A protein has these predicted regions:
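Metal-dependent polysaccharide deacetylase catalytic core of the NodB/CE4 family, i.e.
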Residues: 39-136, 141-142, 148-156, 180-192
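Short N-terminal helix/helix-N-cap motif within the alpha/beta-hydrolase-1
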Residues: 31-32, 125-126, 195
């Protein structure tokens, strides 16, 4: 039954060539370094934030304060939902997940969008059901470009991780430019000595420059959803 409920699909225009840059957990470096790189080109990113992590130090570095989040929202970046407690969506009851998403939304009242990403990339039918109740899109970590018929509750994305290099990311940009689609990138920290889940400023800048050179449109996740659902 849950599979039927969560299978609402959207058909993407084959002419779309769009890129979204997204960041999970809100480490400070993803704002002050990656955010600045995006802004130099007039771009904005989507930041999936968990209120329960604010100002803590995690494996991806120091997490930002509420003040920084408000500042970057005012600068045009999208602040999106990542649950209040950064909980594993796959291991909890759908009702608990809905409550956790709503609690996070309340904490960031007035500045948070209806976009969501699954912490740890953990997603199943129950998690998609919960996400559909209170969000308009949910990004996972299944690799690939979104094209053709897509499930907005399980958006594909491509990771930008230093330990993997960025060749695959650059190849994906070329693929999107040639064959169309919506290419979503995700990472965590962006610093000279990144975690296993982050990348360096040089890698991120090179990727952004490649997107620019291919004349791809860069939008936040919310902006894309508004466009394709019109």
């Amino acid at each position: 039954m849950l599979e039927k409920i969560t299978k609402k699909r959207i058909c993407l225009d084959t002419k779309l060539t769009i890129v979204s840059f997204t960041f999970d957990d809100a480490p400070l470096s993803s704002f002050t370094l990656a955010g600045e790189i995006l802004e130099k080109h007039g771009f904005r990113g989507t930041y999936y934030v968990s209120a329960g992590l604010l100002e803590k130090t995690t494996e991806v570095g120091k997490i930002v304060s509420l003040g920084t989040i408000v500042e970057y929202r005012q600068r045009g970046h999208e602040i999106a939902n990542h649950t209040y407690g950064h909980i594993n969506s796959e291991n909890c009851d759908p009702i608990d997940l809905i409550q956790n998403i709503q609690e996070n939304k309340k904490k960031f009242d007035g500045i948070i969008s209806s976009s969501f990403s699954y912490p740890y990339g953990a997603v199943n039918s129950a998690a998609r059901f919960a996400a559909r109740i209170c969000t308009t899109s949910a990004r996972g970590i299944s690799s690939g470009i979104n094209r053709g018929i897509i499930n907005p509750m399980d958006l594909r994305a491509v990771r930008i991780y230093n330990r993997l290099g960025i060749k695959n990311c650059l190849d994906m940009v070329s693929d999107c430019a040639t064959h169309g689609g919506w290419l979503i990138f995700y990472t965590h920290d962006v610093c000279d000595n990144p975690s296993s889940y982050g990348c360096t400023p040089e890698q991120f800048n090179n990727l952004v420059q490649t997107v620019v050179s291919k004349n791809l449109t860069v939008l936040t996740v919310q902006q894309v959803m508004e466009r394709i659902c019109m």
